């Protein structure tokens, strides 16, 4: 999205790709709560540039838009066709999700939320194939997050941890993960909000 571009984070990634002489195309029009139109536009660029893989840079919105492109690249049709549970039949292209926030956990989840602009509803897409092939959480990329966004995404992470802990589907393993997440958020979130350059706090929030 444009925030990533304006913050100079995109250039960090493109410099690496340029040094490796890798060709790429950039879609930077994703909005918070990405829409079916975002997905369609991004997929048109994917086809036009003859792309063979997907890299998303950002938070949950960027990753969800990338997942939407993955559905269309691997299976065709429209994103609306995949609303529901496990509607895809074929695998995605290779997909790398690079995080710049610490909250949504979309980079490791099989959920994709896309706004249907005609019905004015959020479509819930649950499909194991949309889990990224590789997820990268680098605290250095999160140091530019402003305090308000750091706090908001941190509370999002806390909400996910509490939800997992009180879920009727919880297991001893998920409880252990949720407890550790709450412990780390309690220890590091306030530090990350107070000083965005605190690498230990940023890493703890990853």
Segments (PLM) and residue ranges:
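A glycine/threonine-rich phosphate-anchoring loop and its flanking beta-alpha core
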Residues: 74-172
């Amino acid at each position: 999205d444009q925030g990533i571009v304006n913050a100079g984070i995109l250039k960090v990634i493109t410099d690496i790709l340029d040094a490796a002489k890798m060709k790429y195309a950039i879609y930077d029009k994703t909005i918070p709560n990405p829409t079916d139109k975002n997905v369609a536009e991004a997929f048109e660029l994917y086809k036009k540039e003859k792309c063979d893989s997907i890299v998303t840079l950002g938070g949950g919105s960027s990753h969800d838009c990338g997942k939407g492109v993955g559905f269309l690249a691997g299976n065709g049709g429209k994103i609306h066709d995949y609303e529901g549970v496990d509607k895809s039949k074929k695998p995605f292209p290779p997909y790398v999700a690079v995080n710049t926030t610490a909250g949504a956990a979309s980079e490791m989840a099989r959920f994709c939320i896309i706004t249907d602009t005609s019905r004015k509803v959020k479509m819930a897409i649950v499909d194991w194939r949309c889990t990224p092939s590789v997820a990268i959480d680098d605290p250095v990329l999160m140091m530019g997050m402003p305090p308000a966004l750091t706090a908001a995404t941190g509370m999002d992470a806390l909400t996910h941890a509490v939800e997992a802990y009180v879920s009727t589907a919880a297991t001893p393993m998920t409880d252990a993960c949720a407890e550790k997440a709450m412990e780390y958020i309690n220890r590091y979130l306030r530090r990350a909000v107070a000083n965005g350059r605190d690498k230990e706090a940023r890493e703890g929030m990853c």
